[in-house]
C-alpha cells in the first residue's frame, strides 16, 4: 500500500513538521481512563504527530501520583485473563469474575498472531469448573451470574476477586494464584492454581453455608472420539481431600475379535448406495488406469476410486478443479471402533468443504481431507464413542480453486488399527485434581464414565459463621499432562514438572505439605512489590508482563531447557533479538537466562566462527542485534550470579561471539556496514545507528568481562574499537537532532529507515544503563535523540496515523496513543524509499506501535532524566491495554503474550536507578521519582527485599532490608549531593566504611564484606 498522505513525507520541511499539532485526546470513549490531552482546536487535526502533545495537566499529574490500586468492575471484567499457572506449565486464565478460562494445559498447539489486539479473546472454557455457595435451598455461583457486585484487582501473581450482593447475607473474597517466589524457579513452576476463599457473614444472625468446588474430568479431553474410560476417585490424606481425575483404555481382553466390514471398495461402474449431486463425481468411480497421467499414481488398494478431478466436467485442469459435487452414502450403524479410508487430493482451506466427513445424528463429527497431493494415504476415524448410533458418510468437493478436488479409496469398518496411538502417549493423557485443604463435608462424582459422557466431581465444605465472622477455605487445582510436543520445534520433549512429580496427586500433596511457605512467600513478594512509593499504575504495568512466563509462550522442557516462542505458538527458537529486550526473567529467575546462554546461545546455536543462530537449532543465520545482545546478556547473567564460575565457563564462547561481530565491522571503526539481519526481519545495509549502537555496547560489555577473567589483551582490543566507534557514531550518524542511518547506495532496494526517526536508534545506551556500563553513547546527542522520538514519534492518536499512513498491523486503534516505530520528518527520505523493494509486511512495521520497543524507550528516557516523557510513553501503552478495551495481561505483537514485552521490567529498574553485580558484591540505587522519599523492591543473586530512602531536615537515610534469602555486599552506590559523612549500620552495629564521591554519586565501600540475611536491615545515614 502506498503512502496515502496528501502531502508526501519527502516534501515536509522540518519547520512545517514541527508546526503539526495535536490530534484528539485519549480515553474519550472510556470515561474511567484519565484524559491525556486536550482540548484541541480544529487545526490540531491537520497533522498526525504534533510537536506540542497538548498533555492535560491532570493527566501529567496522574503519571507521578501514587494513586490507588485499580479495581475493575462491570464491562471492565469481560476481557480479563490473568495467567495463574506456574512457569512453563501451560496457560490458564483467571477471569474477571473468578472463573477459569483458556485451559491451555493439555498440550494442544495454539497459534496466535496479531489479531487479538483489534479483536480480543472472549472467555471460553472446554470443560466445567466452578465454585458455588449454598445458602438454604439456594445455590449461588461465585461469578457474575451469582453476585450482582463483582470486582477484580490484579496484582500479579495474585488475582483478587470480591463478591457482594445486597440480597445475600455474605461477602466473599477470592485470592487466586500459583506459587511465585523470585529466585526459587522450581517452586514457581508448579502446575497448580490456588484458590483462597474468605467468606464473611455481613448479617446479625448466624449463617450456615457450604462452599463447593466442581471440576469436570479433562483427561484425554481432545481424544474423546476414541474408546476409553474416565475415572474419578477421592483421596483423603491428613491434610487434604482430593478429587483425582484420570483416564484409561477400555479393557478389551475379553472382547471377541470382530471381522472387518468393507463398506465400500468402489469396484462397480456406478455409485450404487450413494446419492450423487453436482458435476464433480461423474456417473461412477473411475478406473485408476483412466485417471489423467498428470495426476500420477493415486495409490490405494482397489482398481476403481473416487476422484473428483478425473471425473469432473471440463477440459482444463482449472475447470476440473472448479467443478463441485457431493456423494452421500447409505445410512449405517456404527459397529466397529474405526473407519479406515484412503484419501488424497486437496487440503480443506478456509470455509470450503473438501474431503470425507462422518455425519452422526445430522451433525458432522469427524472430517478428513488430502494434503494437496493426488497420492492417497491411509487414514482413519476413531468412532468407538459413537457405537450403536446411525451415521452416514459424505464425500464433498465444494472447493473451486487450485487443488479443488478429492480422491477416496476403499472404506473399511474395523476394530484393529495399526496406527492407533497408545492412550498413555496421547498429548492430553494425564491427571487432574481438585483438592480441599482439610476435610471435605460433601463429595460426589466418585465413579467412571465412557469418553462420550461428561464426568464431574465435587467437594464441599460446610461453614457456620457467627454474626460478623469470617472463615477461609482453600482449594488447590493441579494438573499433570507430561506428553508435550511443540509443533515445528520438538517431538516428545515432555514437561519439566513431570520430572518432579508423577501425577497431579503428587503435585497437590507437595503444595499441601509446603503451603504455608509457598503461599506466604508468594504474598510476601506481592506485598513487597506494591509496598512502594511508585505509582500503582506503574507497578502494575511494569510487572504484569512477567506473567508471560506462565503462558504458552514459555516452556520448561523435561531436560530442563528453557524455551520460548516469540508469542504463543508463533515463531520458534527463543528468538535472540526478541528476548534481547526482555529484562524480567534475568532479574527474577536468573537461572533460566543462564541456562539459555550456556545450553543454547553459546552452546548448540553457536557456529565454529562465533556466529550464533538467533533461533537456536531452528534457523541457520545470525542476526546482528541478537549477536550483540548475547554478549550483553552474558554480562547481565554474570552480574546476577553469586560468583564468577558461570562467566568463566562461557567466556571462550562469549569472546568468540564478540570476535565475529568485530569481523563484521571489517575496518574496526566501530560501525558495522555490511548486511545486518535484525529484529525487523530483513537485512539492512550501510551504517545503521541502532545496530552499531548495540555493537558498541557489546564491545563495552565484552571489555568488562575480559577484565574480570584476566584477558587484558582482548579487553584493550574491544576498548580501542569502542573509542573509535564512539567518535564515528557521533560524527557520522548524528544529524544535529537525532541519529540516522547512512544507507548503502548499492542496496537501495533493501528496507532501511534511512534518515527516519527510528525507535531503537540509541538502544545501545539503554542496554548500558541496564548493566551498569560506563556511557557508550554521548549524553547530549543521546538525549536529543530521545527528545526527537518524543517530538516525531509520540502520537496522541497513533491509530489515526496508522489509518492514514498504512500499512502495518493494528497495535493502536484510532484514539489510542503510542510511540511509533519510525517516522520520516526529513526531506529526501519517506516510507516508500525506506521500503525500497522489500516486502510490505516488513516495511509496515514502521507505522506500528510495538509494546516491547516502547517499554525500552520509556525506560531509557527515565534513565536520562526525561521522566515525564518516559512515564507518558509507558502510561499511553498502559492505557491502550485498559481492561475496558482488551486483556491487560496480554500485550500482543506477533502473537499473544509477546516475549519482548518483558522489557517492561527494565522500565521499573530505570525508575529505581538500579545497579547490581553479584560477584563484586555491589548494589546501587539512584531513584528517578521522589528520591527524597522513595521505596522499592529489589532482587539479587541470592535474595530479595526492599530498598528505601528518606530525607529529613536535609539529611538522607537509606535502608536495604532483605526479606528472602540473603545479600552479600562490599560496595553500595547511592546519590546524595550534600552529605559530608556516611555511617553504615547492620543489625545496629556500626561498620567501617570508605566513601568516594563522583558528582552526586557516593560509592560506599565496606571494610569487610557483609551478608545480610532475611529479616536483617542495612542502614546508611548521610550527614
Residue ranges and their predicted role:
Residues 567-613, 627, 648, 652, ...:
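Active-site core of glycosidic bond-cleaving carbohydrate-active enzymes
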Residues 255-288, 417:
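Extracellular carbohydrate-recognition regions
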Residues 88, 99-101, 107-175, 182-185, ...:
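Non-catalytic C-terminal accessory modules of carbohydrate-active enzymes
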Residues 5-25:
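N-terminal secretory signal peptides and thylakoid transit peptides that target proteins
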Residues 310-335, 377-379, 459-460, 956-958:
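Short beta-strands within extracellular/lumenal beta-sheet-rich domains
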Residues 332-340, 389, 966-969:
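Extended extracellular/luminal ectodomain segments enriched in beta-structured repeat modules
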Residues 359-390, 396-404:
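Extracellular carbohydrate recognition and processing domains
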Residues 38-65, 71-76, 160, 165-173, ...:
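Acidic/polar, glycine-enriched structural segments that form the non-catalytic walls/loops
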Amino acid at each position: 500500500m502506498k503512502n496515502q498522505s496528501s502531502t508526501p513525507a519527502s516534501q515536509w520541511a522540518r519547520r512545517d513538521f514541527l508546526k503539526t499539532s495535536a490530534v484528539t485526546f485519549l480515553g474519550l470513549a472510556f470515561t474511567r481512563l484519565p484524559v491525556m490531552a486536550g482540548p484541541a482546536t480544529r487545526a490540531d487535526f491537520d497533522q498526525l504527530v504534533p510537536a506540542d502533545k497538548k498533555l492535560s495537566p491532570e493527566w501529567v499529574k496522574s503519571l507521578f501520583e501514587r494513586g490507588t490500586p485499580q479495581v475493575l468492575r462491570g464491562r471492565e471484567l469481560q476481557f480479563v485473563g490473568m495467567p495463574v499457572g506456574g512457569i512453563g506449565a501451560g496457560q490458564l486464565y483467571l477471569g474477571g469474575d473468578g472463573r477459569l478460562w483458556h485451559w491451555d494445559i493439555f498440550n494442544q498447539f495454539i497459534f496466535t498472531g496479531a489479531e487479538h489486539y483489534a479483536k480480543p479473546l472472549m472467555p471460553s472454557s472446554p470443560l466445567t469448573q466452578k465454585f458455588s455457595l449454598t445458602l438454604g435451598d439456594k445455590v449461588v455461583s461465585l461469578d457474575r451470574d451469582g453476585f450482582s457486585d463483582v470486582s477484580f484487582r490484579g496484582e500479579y501473581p495474585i488475582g483478587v476477586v470480591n463478591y457482594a450482593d445486597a440480597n445475600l447475607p455474605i461477602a466473599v473474597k477470592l485470592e487466586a494464584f500459583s506459587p511465585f517466589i523470585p529466585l526459587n524457579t522450581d517452586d514457581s513452576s508448579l502446575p497448580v492454581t490456588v484458590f483462597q476463599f474468605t467468606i464473611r457473614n455481613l448479617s446479625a444472625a448466624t449463617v450456615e453455608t457450604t462452599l463447593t468446588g466442581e471440576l469436570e474430568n479433562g483427561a484425554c479431553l481432545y481424544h474423546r472420539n476414541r474408546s476409553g474410560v474416565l475415572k474419578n476417585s477421592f483421596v483423603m490424606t491428613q491434610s487434604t481431600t482430593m478429587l483425582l481425575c484420570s483416564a484409561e483404555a477400555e479393557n478389551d481382553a475379553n472382547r471377541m475379535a470382530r471381522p472387518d466390514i468393507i463398506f465400500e471398495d468402489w469396484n462397480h461402474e456406478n455409485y450404487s448406495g450413494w446419492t450423487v449431486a453436482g458435476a464433480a463425481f461423474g456417473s461412477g468411480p473411475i478406473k485408476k488406469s483412466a485417471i489423467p497421467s498428470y495426476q500420477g499414481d493415486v495409490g490405494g488398494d482397489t482398481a476403481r476410486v473416487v476422484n473428483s478431478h478425473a471425473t469432473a466436467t471440463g477440459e482444463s485442469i482449472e475447470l476440473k478443479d472448479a467443478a463441485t459435487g457431493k456423494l452421500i452414502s447409505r445410512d449405517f450403524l456404527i459397529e466397529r471402533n474405526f473407519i479406515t479410508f484412503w484419501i488424497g487430493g486437496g487440503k480443506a482451506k478456509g470455509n470450503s468443504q473438501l474431503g470425507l466427513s462422518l455425519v452422526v445424528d445430522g451433525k458432522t463429527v469427524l472430517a478428513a481431507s488430502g494434503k494437496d497431493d493426488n497420492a492417497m494415504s491411509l487414514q482413519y476415524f476413531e468412532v468407538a464413542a459413537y457405537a450403536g448410533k446411525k451415521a452416514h458418510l459424505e464425500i464433498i468437493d465444494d472447493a473451486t480453486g487450485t487443488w479443488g478436488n478429492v480422491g477416496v479409496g476403499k472404506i473399511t469398518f474395523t476394530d484393529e488399527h495399526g496406527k492407533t496411538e497408545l492412550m498413555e502417549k496421547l498429548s492430553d493423557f494425564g491427571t487432574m485434581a481438585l483438592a480441599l485443604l482439610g476435610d471435605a463435608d460433601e463429595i460426589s462424582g466418585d465413579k467412571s464414565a465412557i469418553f462420550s459422557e461428561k464426568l464431574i466431581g465435587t467437594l464441599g465444605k460446610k461453614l457456620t459463621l457467627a454474626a460478623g465472622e469470617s472463615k477461609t477455605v482453600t482449594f488447590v487445582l493441579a494438573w499433570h499432562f507430561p506428553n508435550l510436543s511443540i509443533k515445528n520445534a520438538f517431538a516428545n520433549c515432555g514437561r519439566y514438572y513431570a520430572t518432579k512429580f508423577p501425577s497431579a496427586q503428587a503435585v497437590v500433596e507437595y503444595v499441601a505439605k509446603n503451603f504455608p511457605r509457598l503461599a506466604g512467600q508468594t504474598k510476601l513478594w506481592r506485598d513487597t512489590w506494591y509496598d512502594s512509593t511508585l505509582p500503582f499504575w506503574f507497578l502494575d504495568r511494569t510487572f504484569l508482563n512477567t506473567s508471560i512466563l506462565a503462558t504458552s509462550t514459555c516452556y520448561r522442557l523435561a531436560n530442563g531447557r528453557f524455551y520460548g516462542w516469540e508469542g504463543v505458538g508463533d515463531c520458534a527458537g527463543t528468538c535472540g533479538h526478541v528476548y534481547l529486550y526482555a529484562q524480567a526473567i534475568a532479574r527474577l529467575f536468573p537461572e533460566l537466562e543462564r541456562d539459555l546462554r550456556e545450553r543454547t546461545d553459546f552452546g548448540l546455536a553457536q557456529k565454529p566462527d562465533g556466529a550464533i543462530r538467533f533461533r537456536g537449532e531452528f534457523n541457520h543465520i545470525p542476526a546482528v542485534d541478537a549477536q550483540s545482545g548475547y554478549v550483553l546478556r552474558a554480562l547481565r547473567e554474570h552480574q546476577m550470579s553469586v560468583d564468577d564460575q558461570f562467566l568463566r565457563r562461557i567466556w571462550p564462547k562469549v569472546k568468540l561471539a564478540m570476535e565475529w561481530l568485530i569481523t563484521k565491522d571489517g575496518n574496526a571503526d566501530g560501525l558495522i556496514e555490511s548486511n545486518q539481519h535484525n529484529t525487523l526481519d530483513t537485512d539492512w545495509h550501510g551504517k545503521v545507528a541502532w545496530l552499531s549502537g548495540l555493537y558498541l555496547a557489546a564491545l563495552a560489555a565484552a571489555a568488562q568481562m575480559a577484565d574480570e577473567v584476566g584477558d587484558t589483551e582482548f579487553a584493550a582490543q574491544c576498548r580501542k574499537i569502542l573509542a573509535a566507534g564512539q567518535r564515528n557514531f557521533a560524527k557520522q550518524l548524528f544529524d544535529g537532532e537525532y541519529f540516522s542511518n547512512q544507507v548503502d547506495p548499492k542496496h537501495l532496494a533493501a528496507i532501511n529507515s534511512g534518515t527516519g526517526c527510528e525507535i531503537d536508534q540509541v538502544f545501545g545506551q539503554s542496554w548500558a544503563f541496564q548493566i551498569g556500563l560506563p556511557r557508550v553513547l554521548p549524553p547530549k546527542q543521546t538525549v536529543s535523540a530521545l527528545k526527537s522520538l518524543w517530538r516525531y514519534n509520540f502520537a496522541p492518536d497513533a491509530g489515526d496515523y496508522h489509518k492514514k499512513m498504512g500499512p502495518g498491523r493494528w497495535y493502536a486503534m484510532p484514539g489510542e496513543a503510542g510511540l511509533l516505530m519510525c517516522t520520516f520528518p526529513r526531506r529526501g527520505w519517506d516510507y516508500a524509499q525506506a521500503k525500497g523493494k522489500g516486502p510490505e509486511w516488513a516495511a509496515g512495521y514502521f507505522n506500528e506501535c510495538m509494546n516491547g520497543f516502547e517499554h525500552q524507550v520509556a525506560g531509557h528516557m527515565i534513565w536520562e532524566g526525561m521522566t515525564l516523557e518516559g512515564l507518558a510513553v509507558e502510561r499511553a501503552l498502559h492505557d491502550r491495554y485498559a481492561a475496558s478495551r482488551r486483556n491487560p495481561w496480554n500485550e500482543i505483537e506477533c502473537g499473544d503474550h509477546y516475549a519482548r514485552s518483558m522489557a517492561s521490567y527494565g522500565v521499573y529498574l530505570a525508575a529505581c536507578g538500579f545497579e547490581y553485580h553479584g560477584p563484586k558484591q555491589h548494589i546501587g540505587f539512584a531513584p528517578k521519582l521522589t528520591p527524597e522519599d522513595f521505596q522499592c523492591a529489589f532482587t539479587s543473586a541470592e535474595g530479595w527485599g526492599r530498598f528505601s530512602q528518606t530525607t529529613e531536615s536535609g539529611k538522607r537515610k537509606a535502608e536495604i532490608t532483605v526479606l528472602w534469602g540473603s545479600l552479600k555486599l562490599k560496595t553500595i552506590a547511592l546519590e546524595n549531593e550534600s552529605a559530608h559523612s556516611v555511617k553504615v549500620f547492620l543489625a545496629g552495629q556500626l561498620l567501617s566504611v570508605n566513601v568516594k564521591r563522583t558528582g552526586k554519586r557516593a560509592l560506599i565501600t565496606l571494610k569487610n564484606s557483609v551478608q545480610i540475611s532475611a529479616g536483617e536491615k542495612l542502614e546508611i545515614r548521610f550527614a
